[in-house]
């Protein structure tokens, strides 16, 4: 600084805010030409004046600063001053260039960019949040009609996050560009007085961008956190509690309650159920395992559900067996799958000889206001009873008074002996009896 000041004063060159003594044609005597003193008072006074003039530059008006800058640019010693500054910078610039190296891209910023691209938040609008939601839904096993509303909410919220992100990113880029343009214009203006190369301007722009990158990283990090929270609330939560379709649940429940004494389907049955429900065999196995656990923990809660499926089964059997006549019909042959149909619109009952079975369930209201209490089957015929399915060692669903559809649940107390079921059809005052062949589900020995 002292050397530059002496050179400028020796050559009559001034700087903005520093007046040139003696006019443009006169040179100020160099301090070295003055008589030396023991304490160096003239040199200290000269440096103090220069510093004082520099401090007063900020107090100058714009017109005064422009006038002094114009006077400096028009001074005849300006080229000499500029060449001296270039020589000084050439000596000191080597160490500066060697110390500055290109900094690598921040890996954290790269991870944030990759995540925003994968979620459809960053990048061009090619489906955006809708494409990301569709991809996530496909990965989670598809979208059922029950979850379509939730997926719509997810897409809407992801679209809002994308809009906010791009709006804030646009503000950030605008502020960064404005500041960079201002600095570049300032450096170009200063390059008329002091040597500034284009590479130095580029280096300064890179420094500005690195300073602004902290703001950009904060914006991207907060956006990624918002996307992760949204995923945890919608897609990830749904993936953990994926539900089967209503039709698949109906098929599985019907099989479970029709095999309640032994709800362990074979591999063939699992494959058939999986095909009907459009799911995998492992999903069928998991469903039955969970269903058995829930049923054992709370039998009373699932009792009503069992009654509902019993009514559905009984109604389907009785409706399928209607022939339009009052005479009884013979059930299907041995390939009927373990059940036989009871036809006719009249009230019917089934009495089994040689065994008893206990009944449990709630008493219901029969036709005519007569109470129906838990009862035991006996060889004697009882009217107003209808049987839907009969299998050994399984729970027997009996529909009491078909016109009322009151369901009762019976359980075998001992293995069934060899017996012949008798169908009693109550018609008026008389009984008409017919012997039926044993269904394949009943023991033959």
Swiss-Prot record:
Compositionally biased region (Polar residues): 319-332
PROSITE patterns: HOMEOBOX_1, HOMEOBOX_2, PBC
GO cellular component, one term: transcription regulator complex
Gene Ontology biological process terms, A to Z: animal organ morphogenesis; brain development; embryonic organ development; eye development; neuron development; positive regulation of transcription by RNA polymerase II
DNA-binding region boundaries: 237-299
Residues annotated as domain PBC: 42-236
Keywords assigned: Activator, DNA-binding, Homeobox, Nucleus, Transcription, Transcription regulation
Keyword DNA-binding part of the UniProt annotation: yes
Sequence similarity: Belongs to the TALE/PBX homeobox family.
Protein purpose: Transcriptional activator that binds the sequence 5'-ATCAATCAA-3'.
Entry protein name: Pre-B-cell leukemia transcription factor 2
Source organism (scientific name): Xenopus laevis
Gene encoding the protein: pbx2
